Amino acid sequence: MSNPTIEGDENRKENTKSNTKPNFDDLDDLDDILDDLDVPSAFKNEEKKNIDEHKQTGNTSKENERIKNDDNLNSLIQEMMSKFEDLGGPSGLDGSQLSSSFQNDQLLNVILEDQFATEKDSDNGAVNYGALEAALNSLMSQVTSKEILYEPLKDLEANYPKFLKNAKETEKQGFEEQYQKIQKCIQIFESPEYDARKDADIISKLVEEIQEKPLPAPLIDNSMETAGCPTQ
């Protein structure tokens, strides 16, 4: 005759076993425990596969981050190269020549060495994009600086009114808008608050807008070309 008390205790033990779930803090612990447990090999292999995939995913994430950093770096440099190609460089250097020279690794390393953002973050090896962008913007501010652009723009401003007086009515509006942008550049350069770095973006934008329409042929005296501003 069975003892109800013993059977009840056994049932409670079985229920306790079936309801108890292991709480593993680490996937490596789970991996070790699976090796010790007597479970079907198919299940064990599947769990091992999941653990390995998890570990590989971590490594893949780091690799993807590195690739993303490299892509961002290339995009940033390419964007700055495009700006240089649009604006041209100092001393009459053609814009396309300047941008292509950026693709020379040796020159690029010289430009970016020391504080110019080739340094890596000590923790994750990521490119310091803030420092890199600051370095490239510094170069941009030199190309669009008062020392390079002010005199040729003043020459254009001085001769523009006479040209507009004799210009065809169909062409006047476009040239007047161009003239206003030239004046705006000069106003920025002559302002007591002018700052080459701070104002580089607006000067760059204005010069690009000026170049959207070819400069009047009678006003071209090579001064803009000498400053590195293509006249189209």
Swiss-Prot record:
Pfam families: Pex19. Residues 25-38 have a biased composition (Acidic residues). One of its GO terms (molecular function) is peroxisome membrane targeting sequence binding. It comes from the Eukaryota. Residues 1-71 are annotated as: Disordered. InterPro entries: Pex19, Pex19_C_sf. Residues 44-71 have a biased composition (Basic and acidic residues). GO terms for cellular component: cytosol; peroxisomal membrane. One of its GO terms (biological process) is protein import into peroxisome membrane. This is Uncharacterized protein C17C9.14. It comes from Schizosaccharomyces pombe (strain 972 / ATCC 24843).
